[in-house]
Amino acid sequence: MKIASLKLLLLVSLLFAVTQNGISIQNSETSVNQNSCMPNEPRCTGCPGGGSGGYRGPPPPCCKNDSDCKAHCPEGGYCSNQCDCVCNLVKVMNNDVRCQVDTDCNMKCSKQGYCKLAS
C-alpha cells in the first residue's frame, strides 16, 4: 500500500512539475514576443515622423522615437512599417512632389531615406 501511495505521489508531483514547466515556457514565449522590439533597440534605419518637419507617416512598430533608430531621416523622410526610411517630399523644378515610394516620382530614394536626383 505504501509503495502504491508513493508511486501516486511521485506521479502527481511529476505531472505538477511538467504543467508548471509548460506554463513557464508559454509565459517566456509571450514575453519574448511582446518584448521583441525594445525601446532604443538599434534595428531601425530611419526615424518616425519625418525628421524636422516633413509629412508624418504612421508610427511603425520598433521605431517610435528618433533615439530608437541607428540613423535619422533627413527632412521629408519617415520610417516605414519595416523601419526603413522612405522618401516623402522632394522638390522637382521648384514644385513640391509627394512621393511615398520611389516609383511615385522621378527621384530615387537613397538608402539613408531621402530623395535625390536619379543618376
Curated annotation (Swiss-Prot):
Keyword tags: Antimicrobial, Disulfide bond, Fungicide, Plant defense, Secreted, Signal
Swiss-Prot/TrEMBL GO biological process terms: defense response to fungus; killing of cells of another organism
Signal peptide: 1-24
Disulfide feature: 44-99, 63-79, 69-83, 73-85
Subcellular location: Secreted
GO cellular component assignments: extracellular region
Protein name: Defensin-like protein 260
Record organism: Arabidopsis thaliana
